[in-house]
Amino acid sequence: VADARKRNHSSAKAAGARFEREIADWLAVHVDDRIDRRVKTGARDCGDLAGIRAHGQKVIAELKNTAAWNPGTWLREAEKERANDGALAGVVIAKRHGIAAPAQQVVLMTVADFAALLTGVRPAEQEGS
């Protein structure tokens, strides 16, 4: 039996916006009340949430609510947005389908971003380091 709840472009955008709002609201309560959804800016996008900081520096978050996982593409997008914003690190927050609780969603990042979050210093941008 085919799933009757197939997404179209409009319903996918609405689901993405809902996911962004749920994550932003949860982070605002549990981390910093300045965290909120970011206004979309086009080619120089700086992530989906604003107000995330670590060690006094900006961190960008790219949020994904899609059944098909593509972590490589998502991480490249987060890195581009991190550079656009001059942020310390970039992370991807991905929806775990069937799991509603915002705190139970998944965060993906490179080891370089993980090190930056832990130390407050972005590692040298050399291949393999």
Range-by-range predicted roles:
Residues V1-S129:
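Catalytic phosphate/metal-binding cores of nucleic-acid and nucleotide-processing enzymes, i.e., regions
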